[in-house]
Amino acid sequence: MTVHRQFLLINPNTSEDTTHRLYQHISPWLPPGIELDVRTVQKGARYISCEASHAVAACALLETWADYLSVHPALDGVLIGCFGDPGLFALRESSACQVTGLAEASFMEASQRGPFSIVTGGVRWKPMLRRLALSLGFGDALRHIETVTQTGAELQADPDMAVQCLTRACQAAALPGVNSIILGGAGLAGYAPLIQPHVSLPLIDSAEAGIRVLLAGGLPQPSRSASGFEARLNHLNPSVLSLAD
């Protein structure tokens, strides 16, 4: 008998187009018995590209998750659909199920091959991703971050331009001692097969890595038996207030 498992993908960007792109790209990876619901946050930036938009996205993610739980309390895992994982630590602290994001999952897969590079859109992401890798324990494995000036939203909107500039970036990121390259970003989902023939190192699609790692279950175990927040969070959605301990 097929075991039914329920997962949730939250896009912390407010772009429904990006949510659709993510779902269309990762849905073929879902085995029988797996249901993946998708939600898009209603507050924040259309596409996260700086510290401020990342911070707002973390709060919006928690509200979206709490709203979902108020209707669907049984949940087996949550995937944060942004290569930057806003709200990862807060959601992991609060959730009774496993949680990961596109960045953490990609780091996990890439590090199995050894040192890795990242290619992504938006120059402000470089220090943010370096900090995230350090906080997750992948600081030594991350050898290089190559950014392109275009944001993930711009790369998503112009596939021909995206493939050209991302190919050049991946070639630049293929440094000695690097064993794989993460193509990071929700808006970059699906570009890896188009770029791979022109790059000598294996490319890791962050969206694919996200769903693979989430389904495999090799993530930190929840510290809670029931979802909830350690502190009462005032002036937020009623669903958030209902989860306060």
Name the predicted role of every residue range.
Residues 91-113, 195-214:
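Short, acidic/small-residue loops that bind anionic groups at enzyme active sites
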Residues 55-74, 164-177:
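Short, well-structured alpha-helical segments in soluble
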Residues 122-186, 191:
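Active-site rim beta-loop-alpha module in soluble metabolic enzymes
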Residues 9-10, 75-82, 177-186:
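Periplasmic-binding protein-like
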Residues 10-12, 39, 119, 184:
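Short hydrophobic segments within beta-strands
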Residues 208, 212-213, 221-245:
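C-terminal functional extensions of proteins
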Residues 38-63, 153-158:
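N-terminal beta-loop-helix "entrance" segment that forms/cooperates
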Residues 5-29:
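N-terminal beta1-alpha1 ligand-phosphate binding loop
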